[in-house]
């Protein structure tokens, strides 16, 4: 759901570099296999998802061949998190939600018109799954209590940091102002 330290924060125990070395090795040694990365887009995905799209595209390009049953070497299957609601993209400020749209635009840029073995890039399905996250983010229901969920988010990251020995604000400096404002309020 992200890259580098932010991915390692959300997937505690993950070594980001080792993960990608293993994906690369897997695709190299098994040229008929397709890797499907299932990503649950959440409030912490916003800042590095575009970088993840770059990385997946790099692997698509490097490992494209005509031996695979599924055309692409690697697919990014993006879903959005609904529960727990305090980790949903709906808690974010509008400026952060715009980053979701930028990720969808990047996937569209890397998209392919024809899904054939001699092409590489993001399929229309991969692109649409990222686009719908933006629609979900801006389409906040009147039943969604943004203020309560933001408070619960702060409680969650504070408890997470205490238990794991991590530091949310250092890992996600883009959310420092959001964190401070919602911790007070």
Predicted regions mapped to residue ranges:
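Radical SAM enzyme [4Fe-4S]-AdoMet core and its adjacent flexible, acidic
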Residues: 1-185
């Amino acid at each position: 759901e992200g890259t580098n330290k932010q991915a390692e924060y959300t997937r505690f125990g993950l070594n980001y570099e080792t993960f990608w070395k293993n994906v690369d090795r897997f695709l190299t040694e098994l040229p008929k296999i397709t890797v499907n990365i299932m990503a649950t887009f959440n409030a912490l995905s916003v800042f590095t998802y575009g970088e993840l799209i770059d990385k997946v595209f790099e692997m698509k390009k490097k490992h494209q061949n005509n031996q695979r049953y599924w055309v692409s070497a690697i697919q990014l299957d993006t879903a959005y998190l609904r529960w727990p609601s305090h980790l949903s993209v709906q808690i974010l400020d509008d400026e952060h939600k715009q980053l979701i749209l930028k990720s969808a635009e990047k996937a569209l840029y890397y998209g392919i018109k024809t899904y054939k073995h001699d092409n590489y890039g993001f399929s229309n399905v991969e692109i649409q799954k990222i686009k719908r996250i933006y629609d979900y983010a801006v389409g906040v229901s009147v039943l969604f209590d943004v203020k309560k969920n933001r408070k619960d988010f702060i409680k969650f990251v504070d408890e997470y940091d205490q238990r794991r020995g991590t530091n949310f604000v250092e890992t996600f400096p883009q959310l420092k102002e959001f964190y401070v404002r919602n911790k007070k309020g």
